[in-house]
């Protein structure tokens, strides 16, 4: 018989590549400025998948999961405007602003603030190995699901909780499962901004996982034409249902040739041709897609790299120089998001202007965390897998 200890909770603890174990761990205690959230749903992110497959981004003993939604069950004495029973999305673990004086704050990057209350210590073995997100000494204020326990558990705490700062209420019309898309949707919003889209642009999105499908929907109101590509017919069909204008099955035809056919042959300084897409947002993390993205884009166009690559890529960098491409990337969209942007993203979900429910392909209970991750690895069968503690 399974005996549950007092003040404990069930959690999926990460022990390394392809090794989660559902265990009873100590339930966190909140401080006067914190709130406790009972996790109702947590989405599997692409970075979680890399941790599962390769053992990176986390370390043994942590509880992963950062795309979560739940119900407030405990509120610290100094917290205002958040009540027990509120349905919420907790966002991230970095404070709203840095010290304002350090190297990073002076460069408008407070997410890397050197103040000890905001940034890793720089001294522990993890920091010395440049794995600052795993800092052993400053877990309280680090990102949930990376360096402090996250959403693959029954409960999680939110430090220094503030409404529309790191806690956002869920409208009645939005389910917990749909609300887990708030963080990735904001990421999609920022990645589209990086591309500086114009109303007359043609944009290409390569890779139609959750992020690619969200990027596609955010782009819809900002450009004149969207072309998408993937190797999964399931995901391509979903893109069609979400009103993608042009869909390319990269397993059956050459995406570069098709984009060139649709956009025209644009020559660069080197004299070589290629596509004339104004924007390419590469979300797949496939080496072939990276190379195609460079060739699909017109001279002077924008390439945004979103997908994570498992291996080094051999590539002629002169192609980027000759085409005068604006190449940008981001592992994390940046500093604490302005509250207005997050509220806007929640409104996009609530209004169904960005459709997230069709992206949920599977749901699993916490006890089945391993089958959940195995399912998420199968791109031909899944889109977004939700874990429900």
Where are these regions (language model features)?
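Glycine-rich beta-strand-centered segment in the early N-terminal region that forms part
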Residues: 28-42, 55-128, 169-173
